[in-house]
Amino acid sequence: MIYSRSRLPSEGEILIATVKQVFDYGSYVTLDEYGGLQAFLPWSEVSSKWVKNIRDVLKENRKVVVKVIRVDRRKGTVDVSLKKVTDDERRKKNLQWKKIQRLDKILELVSQQLKLSEKDAWEQVAWKLEAKYGDPISAIERAVKEGEKILIDAGVPEIWIKPLLEEAAKHTEEKKVKMSGLITVKTSEPLGVQKIKEVMSKALENIEQDYESILNVKIYTIGAPRYRVDVVGTNPKDASEALNQIISNLIKIGKEENVDISVVKK
């Protein structure tokens, strides 16, 4: 379980949330980095475009990237927005989330070895490394390569150091794989370029959340009307499935938006 130093997030914070309940007027989500704290996502904050059915955008148990827009510290309530998260913020958060998950797994296993709680691990290891270096998992990876001094200098208690280094060595970053596909994209729409961008943006929604091993996805032109779709991850099977899903999304959404998309090569 992931533990945060603060009971409530701050306004403007970008977080990973899990959709729990979807209603006509909005959705209740839980904030994964705040112990499953419940937050409200209003209908007006779901999408910047008109959406006929909120369930076309939000599905229960799916993870989404949200921005905190209101916090009532007296009542302990939090409101979040989906539409205020930029593509760049979403990409960076997904990468950060994968690091947090790796950190959480390492701390869980080490705390079990030491017969201590996961909260102890976060307080005595993760928070100390964060205070000293900013990024706990990067600090642990440095310690695996450079030695225990990295941990000692951050004030990590001695009892954690040896088992932490041993466990972290088993979880060093996996080798990356890249899957690519070629497509052609054509449209006779007046605002063709904007329409194509919208189709591509919709096709990529939630891909990185649906496949945990996916690190990055990108669609870019290699000379109109040809485009390349790149999927980078640590699991070849997931990367292949994600690529197929993206291309399927592109074709389906393209038909709805009068954009003709065909596969040249996978």
From Swiss-Prot:
The keyword RNA-binding applies. Residues 12-83 form the S1 motif domain. Keywords: Initiation factor, Protein biosynthesis, RNA-binding. The keyword RNA-binding applies. It holds the Pfam family S1. Transmembrane segments: none annotated. Heterotrimer composed of an alpha, a beta and a gamma chain. Belongs to the eIF-2-alpha family. This is Translation initiation factor 2 subunit alpha. The lineage of its organism: Archaea, Thermoproteota, Thermoprotei, Sulfolobales, Sulfolobaceae.
